[in-house]
Each structure stands twice: as structure tokens, then as C-alpha cells.
Curated annotation (Swiss-Prot):
Binds directly to 23S ribosomal RNA and is necessary for the in vitro assembly process of the 50S ribosomal subunit. It is not involved in the protein synthesizing functions of that subunit. This is Large ribosomal subunit protein bL20. One of its GO terms (cellular component) is ribonucleoprotein complex. Gene3D superfamilies: 6.10.160.10, Ribosomal protein L20. Keywords: Ribonucleoprotein, Ribosomal protein, RNA-binding, rRNA-binding. InterPro entries: Ribosomal_bL20, RIBOSOMAL_L20_CS, Ribosomal_protein_bL20_C. Belongs to the bacterial ribosomal protein bL20 family. One of its GO terms (biological process) is ribosomal large subunit assembly. It holds the Pfam family Ribosomal_L20. It comes from Parabacteroides distasonis (strain ATCC 8503 / DSM 20701 / CIP 104284 / JCM 5825 / NCTC 11152). One of its GO terms (molecular function) is rRNA binding.
């Protein structure tokens, strides 16, 4: 009995991966083994960077709040401590947005905790 091989499924799998690697440079887009490895590595990077994105944004918010707070004569840590002591529960994302887009609202918050 001859060996049965499912070429249809194999070809479909290869085609699917090669479709996902469209736009990559060189052999990464059209050589099956290289494309497969590149695609898998891309998934690894995506997984890692979904977590790093959260850190990076938090760091960005802190930098923006710190810059705006220093213009008002406070450091970031003193501002956050004062906000906590005053019972003002506003997260860093919103505070950074206020500092950048609505500086008068940010100044009002700082004036409240000074």
C-alpha cells in the first residue's frame, strides 16, 4: 500500500504562513523554513512587547507629570504624595493627559494639594 500524504493540508499550512510573512525582507517572505522561524519569532516579540508597552506608557505618564509638576514648583513624588494625602484619586494616565492638554486644570489640581 502506498504511503498516504496529505499534500493539501501541508500546502495550505505553508501558504497561510507565507501569507502572514508578506512584506518581510529577503528570504523571510518566501522561503518556508526562514519564513516560519521569522513568523514565530515575531509572535514572541509581540507577546513580550504587549507587556513592555504597559511599562513604557506608565514611564511616559510619570515623565509628563513630573515635568508639569516641576513647572508648578513640586517634584513628582511630592505631588503624588500630596494627592494621596488629600484623598484625590486620579490615575497617572488622566493626570498626564491633563498636564499636556489641559494645563489650567492641572494647575488647579496642584493648587488644591499645595
Amino acid at each position: 500500500m502506498p504511503r498516504s500524504v496529505n499534500h493539501v493540508a501541508s500546502r495550505a499550512k505553508r501558504k497561510r504562513i507565507l501569507k502572514l510573512t508578506r512584506g518581510y525582507y529577503g528570504a523571510r517572505k518566501n522561503v518556508w523554513t526562514v519564513a516560519k522561524n521569522t513568523w514565530e519569532k515575531g509572535l514572541t516579540y509581540a507577546f513580550r512587547d504587549r507587556r513592555n508597552k504597559k511599562r513604557n506608557f506608565r514611564a511616559l505618564w510619570i515623565q509628563r507629570i513630573n515635568a508639569a509638576a516641576r513647572m508648578e514648583g513640586l517634584s513628582y513624588s511630592r505631588l503624588m504624595g500630596a494627592l494621596h494625602a488629600a484623598g484625590i484619586e486620579i490615575n497617572r494616565k488622566v493626570l498626564a493627559d491633563l498636564a499636556v492638554n489641559h494645563p489650567e486644570a492641572f494647575k488647579a489640581i496642584v493648587a488644591k494639594v499645595k
